[in-house]
């Protein structure tokens, strides 16, 4: 609701300052540019990180110097998390696709992904020429989002406009676009398709077109109609007498191939090739129980509860744990009164878990995984008598539940808390690829009477 006023930035400066002459001056110029831009937008940069020795030296005297880079992350207040726009094109012919410019600059190819593929850098880089215009554009788009007038949207970044359009189609499995660029003044089609001037592409229902135009025009924000969705699985791009056809499924393979080539250097046992061959063969699908309504009331949950239930749960965390607040809220919604327990509470004896009926070990990277995944956390239980006694007494009771998420699951494995009665216990081993994996997996929950999974039976 507060627009840019609630936005704060975090800047991560990565620069080879000590490696060669002139880098300090380049860093100063970059910092001043960011500072001036933020002052114009009236937003702050209260935090960040500096890595100013970005150089790799080798025994033969050679060295590789990292390019000076700043990574900026923005955070702001979101008053309604349901008002979101995803970059997935809606296959509806009664909609229109628009481009909204944020730069107020001519289209330029300097520093673009297109230039890099040609082994070039370029000397003309697009930038925001008018900070006040940028602010107006941002606020106008926020108004469109707030009023629910945008069906889909995506920013223009690496790869330019054509990559943005393709990525909006990669996210679905059917349909495409027919794009006409005649209303864009620039005549150079390469610049139109590959320039990375700040801007966005939005999809709007035809019944909302006039309302969208009115908001943008009242704000003085430039926009251009690009085209409409089509049932064909391609993007047709035309300007004047020239038309180009981009096959979406073919271009998706091209788009993914760079990731595959990098993955091939990092993954073992042919996993990279298997992933490349399989990545588009697994649509993400969900199947819920027939009587699932997606309402709190179905499970007797009151999200506005302000009275204690008398049943306590505890979040147990170590240095490096994260996600504990979200987990605490989930437990609260499930009816628990939630308390926050740190390992120092258990080690010192301040906390005994005697009044707790459920504990959750949250995920993250306890002790930065320095000793291995959750091994240091497990040691804090095993080698501190009061913490171990509290845990042993907790699991000896018959009125307790426990859950380990991510790093917390690894902890439960290390502590032998999963099926402790088995003669052989599980161990967390390396993946076949010998690297961290984050995949979409299909899991079916069978009919069960588990306290935590019973309501998901058949999902």
Predicted regions and their residues:
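Intein/HINT protein-splicing elements and their conserved insertion hotspots or analogous self-processing inserts
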Residues: 1, 27-32, 44, 50-194, ...
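Thiamine diphosphate
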Residues: 1-37, 49, 57, 139, ...
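General beta-strand structural signal in soluble alpha/beta enzymes
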Residues: 9, 46-48, 74, 99, ...
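Glycine-rich tight-turn/loop motif centered on a GG-T
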Residues: 16-25, 117-130, 378-384
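A glycine- and small-aliphatic-rich helix-loop capping segment at beta-alpha/alpha-beta transitions
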Residues: 25, 63-66, 170-174, 375-383, ...
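Residues that flank catalytic or metal-binding motifs in active/ligand-binding sites
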Residues: 68, 198, 439, 458
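Catalytic core of tubulin tyrosine ligase-like
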Residues: 202, 433, 444, 448-459
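N-terminal beta1-alpha1 cap of cysteine-dependent amidohydrolase-like domains
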Residues: 239, 243-405, 409-421, 429-440, ...
């Amino acid at each position: 609701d507060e627009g840019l006023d609630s936005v704060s930035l975090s800047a991560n400066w990565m620069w080879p300052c000590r490696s060669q002459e002139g880098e300090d001056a380049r860093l100063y110029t970059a910092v001043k540019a960011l500072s001036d831009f933020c002052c114009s937008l009236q937003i702050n940069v209260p935090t960040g990180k500096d890595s100013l020795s970005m150089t790799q030296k080798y025994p033969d005297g050679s060295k590789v110097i990292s390019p000076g880079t700043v990574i900026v992350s923005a955070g702001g207040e979101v008053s309604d998390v349901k008002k979101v726009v995803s970059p997935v094109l809606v296959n509806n012919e009664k909609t229109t696709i628009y481009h909204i410019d944020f730069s107020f600059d001519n289209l330029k190819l300097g520093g673009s992904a297109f230039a890099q593929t040609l082994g070039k850098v370029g000397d003309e880089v697009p930038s925001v020429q008018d900070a006040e215009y940028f602010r107006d554009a941002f606020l106008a788009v926020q108004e469109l989002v707030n009023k629910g007038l945008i069906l889909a949207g995506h920013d223009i970044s690496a790869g330019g406009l054509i990559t943005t359009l393709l990525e909006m189609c990669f996210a679905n499995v059917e349909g495409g676009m027919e794009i006409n660029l005649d209303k864009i003044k620039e005549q150079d089609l390469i610049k139109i398709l590959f320039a990375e001037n700040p801007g966005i592409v939005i999809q709007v229902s035809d019944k909302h077109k006039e309302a969208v135009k009115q908001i943008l025009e009242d704000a003085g924000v430039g926009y251009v109609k690009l085209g409409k969705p089509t049932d064909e699985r391609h993007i047709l791009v035309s300007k004047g007498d020239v038309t180009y056809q981009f096959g979406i499924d073919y271009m998706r393979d091209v788009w993914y191939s760079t990731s595959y080539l990098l993955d091939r250097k990092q993954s073992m046992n042919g996993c990279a090739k298997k992933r490349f061959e399989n990545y588009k063969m697994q649509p993400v699908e969900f199947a819920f129980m027939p009587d699932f309504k997606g309402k709190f009331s179905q499970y007797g949950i009151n999200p506005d509860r302000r009275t204690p239930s008398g049943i306590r749960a505890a979040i147990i965390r170590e240095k490096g744990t994260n996600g504990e607040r979200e987990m605490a809220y989930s437990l609260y919604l499930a009816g628990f009164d939630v308390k926050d327990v740190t390992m120092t509470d258990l080690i010192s004896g301040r906390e005994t878990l005697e009044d707790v009926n459920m504990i959750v070990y949250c995920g993250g990277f306890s002790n930065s995984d320095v000793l291995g995944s959750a091994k240091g956390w497990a040691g804090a239980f095993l080698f501190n008598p009061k913490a171990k006694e509290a845990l042993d007494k907790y699991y000896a009771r018959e009125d307790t539940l426990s859950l380990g998420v991510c790093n917390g699951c690894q902890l439960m494995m290390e502590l032998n808390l999963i099926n402790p009665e088995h003669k052989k216990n599980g161990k967390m081993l390396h993946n076949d690829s010998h690297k961290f994996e984050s995949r979409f997996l299909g899991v079916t929950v069978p009919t069960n009477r588990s306290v935590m999974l019973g309501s998901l039976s058949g999902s």
